[in-house]
UniProtKB/Swiss-Prot annotation:
It comes from Pseudoalteromonas translucida (strain TAC 125). The lineage of its organism: Bacteria, Pseudomonadati, Pseudomonadota, Gammaproteobacteria, Alteromonadales. Belongs to the bacterial ribosomal protein bL33 family. GO terms for biological process: translation. This is Large ribosomal subunit protein bL33. Keywords: Ribonucleoprotein, Ribosomal protein.
Length: 51
């Protein structure tokens, strides 16, 4: 079962990516380093719910 999630920047810029993940294989919250174009750096993105 794949659920849609938001990956929100921890830099505080408000930038986010949308993606999906398989909750059966990854029950914990996703954390991944990705590029934040607002500050032009790679930062940690954390999972949040899509409203």
């Amino acid at each position: 079962m794949r659920d849609k999630i938001r990956l929100v920047s921890t830099a505080g810029t408000g930038f986010f990516y949308t993606t999906d993940k398989n909750k059966r294989n990854m029950p914990e919250k996703m954390e991944i380093k990705k590029f934040d174009p607002k500050i032009r750096k790679h930062v940690l993105f954390k999972e949040a719910k899509i409203k």
